Amino acid sequence: SLILRAAQRRGLQLADSTLLSYRAEAHGFLAFLAQLGEGVIIPPKVVQTEELALSIAWWQPNRSAQQLVGRRDTTLLPADVGYYRDRYGVILDNLPDRIRLGDGQDVRDVPHPLAPSAMGLYEYQRAEPVRMRIPGREIIVDEVRFRPLNGATPAAIGSVFLDRETAAVVRLSMTFTRAAILDKRIETLVVTLENGLVRERYWLPRRQEVEVSRASPIFDIPVRGIVRGRWEVSNYEVNERIAAVTQALPRWSSVSSDSLKRYQFPGRVIDVLPPEIQIATSEDV
């Protein structure tokens, strides 16, 4: 089946692929939104946001280094906001066989629906295919929906789009069962990974989004804190030599705080936010 091929590819593609290395750049944001009352009446508004720039390097055998090279933030209302460290990085492997998010505080060790060991834990349903055309070639992408056989166990729920020819992941979107979510304040946790075709051959990270909503009632008043993050990955250089100094870096690191501040972002920090997100003002205090 397509799912079995996709599971097998997870273990083989990095060892057998002609993809030897790549470098890329990522641009994104992290935003903290607050909502008082029910959403229909009072929509969430941005309290604090950070704009981020990241350099990415990957090379065989499945080694990588990500370095935060630019960061600026703005706090629109008084707040003490912090983010888990893994929010500052790009997911390079379509999530590992044992999924861990929020530095293991949101979910930890959840079986990936494409992990070879998880085939007996999920049920799968194929939906209508999507046809994509590039010069001289048509790509057929199949959507496969997945959910756990036992909804009371820690597991993922969502869908994955797979290249029918190669079984590579094109898009993966998932949420989680209540049993999988460790922080019981969390109401929703959604992760979406979109890959793009690089050199008309390699499906590599293109866009990633995460949204986590936590409820924290104050004096019986519904209060919700929402973290939204988005990365856009571009400027790929494939099968070029990775410098030794880069290969010596840890999987994630950051330049100095002074260097982060010197990074030149275009426009304003809030310009990176999607237009549907509302900005908090002094009147909201």
Predicted regions and their residues:
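Structured extracytoplasmic
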Residues: 1-157, 178-182, 212-285
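Extended lipid/amphipathic-ligand handling interfaces
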Residues: 158-160, 164, 190-200
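Surface-exposed extracellular loop regions of Gram-negative outer-membrane beta-barrel proteins
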Residues: 166-171, 175
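Beta-strand-dense domains in secreted/periplasmic systems and polymorphic toxin scaffolds
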Residues: 172, 206-208
